Amino acid sequence: MPTINQLVRQGREVETTKSKSPAMQNSPQRRGVCTRVYTTTPKKPNSALRKVAKVRLTNGFEVISYIGGEGHNLQEHSVVLVRGGRVKDLPGVRYHIVRGSLDLQGVKDRKQARSKYGAKKPKAK
């Protein structure tokens, strides 16, 4: 433990926090082009085929992003909007693709949590 005198001379070093989504470079979202769209399996104990895409962002970064929701229309060369946010059971996936924006359509027939999946309000009968 330092003495008061040592603290007066030196001071405490502030710990800098490392970004959890460095490819965003302090932007809320980034545009990118899909270079590969594929499925991958999660870590134990989960089991599924999770839909992910490798995206080249406008700032040159190449990231793996998760495609949320049921069904999607993404292909290679699709232009997408990428936001931060990791997927806990997929190692290396630290970004999400925004549904209902640019080339990615919203989830069809979605009734709840629509804003998260880019779904329009259903017509009232």
UniProtKB/Swiss-Prot annotation:
Cellular component GO terms, alphabetical: small ribosomal subunit
GO-annotated molecular function: rRNA binding; structural constituent of ribosome; tRNA binding
Matching PROSITE patterns: RIBOSOMAL_S12
Biased composition (Polar residues): 19-29
Region Disordered, residue ranges: 1-31
3-methylthioaspartic acid carried by residues: D89
Superkingdom of source: Bacteria
Key words of the record: Methylation, Ribonucleoprotein, Ribosomal protein, RNA-binding, rRNA-binding, tRNA-binding
One Pfam family cited in the UniProt record for this chain: Ribosom_S12_S23
UniProt entry tagged with the keyword Cell membrane: no
Tagged with keyword Transcription regulation: no
Ranges annotated as spanning the membrane: none
Any one Gene Ontology BP term: translation
InterPro entries: NA-bd_OB-fold (IPR012340), Ribosomal_uS12 (IPR006032), Ribosomal_uS12_bac (IPR005679)
Assembly and oligomerization: Part of the 30S ribosomal subunit. Contacts proteins S8 and S17. May interact with IF1 in the 30S initiation complex.
Primary role: With S4 and S5 plays an important role in translational accuracy. Interacts with and stabilizes bases of the 16S rRNA that are involved in tRNA selection in the A site and with the mRNA backbone. Located at the interface of the 30S and 50S subunits, it traverses the body of the 30S subunit contacting proteins on the other side and probably holding the rRNA structure together. The combined cluster of proteins S8, S12 and S17 appears to hold together the shoulder and platform of the 30S subunit.
NCBIfam families according to UniProt: rpsL_bact (TIGR00981)
Family: Belongs to the universal ribosomal protein uS12 family.
Protein name stated in the entry: Small ribosomal subunit protein uS12
Organism in which the protein naturally occurs: Paracidovorax citrulli (strain AAC00-1) (Acidovorax citrulli)
